[in-house]
Amino acid sequence: MNELIREIGKSKGYDDKLCNTLEKIIPAMIMHYGEEYRDLILKVLEETTITICKSNENVYEVLNKLETIEEDESIVGIQDVKIAAGVSSTIPRISCKDGEFSIDKLERHIVLAFGDIESKAQIRTLVHEFSHALKSYENSHYIKGDIYYSRSGFIEIFERLSLDENGKVVRTLISEKNVGMEEGFNSLDDSIITSIITGEDRKFESYRGPAVIAEEADCLLGYRNERIKAQLTGDIDTYKNIYNGSSSEDLFGEQSKNLDEVVKEEYRLFRNILLYGSDKEEDKKLLEEIQNERAKLVHVCRNNIDKAIESKVNVK
């Protein structure tokens, strides 16, 4: 397999260090996600371009050259992208002919911040972003009328398509959901895969609140294979139904909203990460406020899992 991975890497112009890293990551991903997804993982490797920023660049600058990034109401804002360690993005090239929109092609990119790709931190980031790319491949993009749908794992985004005065296709956000849930499960997955690669105990390096809830959902509910299938194939409804069990409530939808609130606090914490160690009282208070809010929201999420466990027990 290493020969195939290196062959794909060299065909895309990757250097030896990146190829060496991919030779560690790809087998570990197959081990974690399952042999049945081997071909899908290799296909994503072949069709995704990995770019590492230069020392004077950030992820936002590189990504913005590929696709103009507009500020909207997304949970992840431009400022979050500017300080991100990495981003996975599927860029649709959409055209309009005779009033009908269509996807001409999809360009798949992973952009990593400047750093040593063989370092543990960069390996974990690449695992995280490659997992996002993997979960946004199958059944993930379509156009219906003037509505563009895109999916990355559990994340579902609906955008309205229109033309500007120059005839350029414009996408306007309508709705976005399940961001916190997806980041939690993806962080759980990247911690396991990174542990397989390094042989060290796994730990959550990012999205800790959502990741803790994701781990508890997998362990306590026992639907790990079903949730991985939902993320990789887009069969979200099946996972949603088994999560809800016999409950008359939409526990999945409720948990999704809870986790979106948790992830907002995660981003808020990350934006203020440089305040750690500050002697200023207002800085200490701000960090304490964010951490307390995150802790409250995590408690709400745990109550939701308790309900899901109860509904599972009551399934006839």
Residue ranges and their predicted role:
Residues 18, 22, 123, 178, ...:
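Hydrophobic (often cysteine-bearing) scaffold residues that line and stabilize catalytic clefts
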Residues 201-316:
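Pan-zinc metallopeptidase signature
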Residues 147-212, 216, 220:
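Post-HExxH zinc-binding segment in Zn-dependent metallohydrolases
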Residues 13, 35-39, 201, 280-283:
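Charged, low-complexity interaction regions
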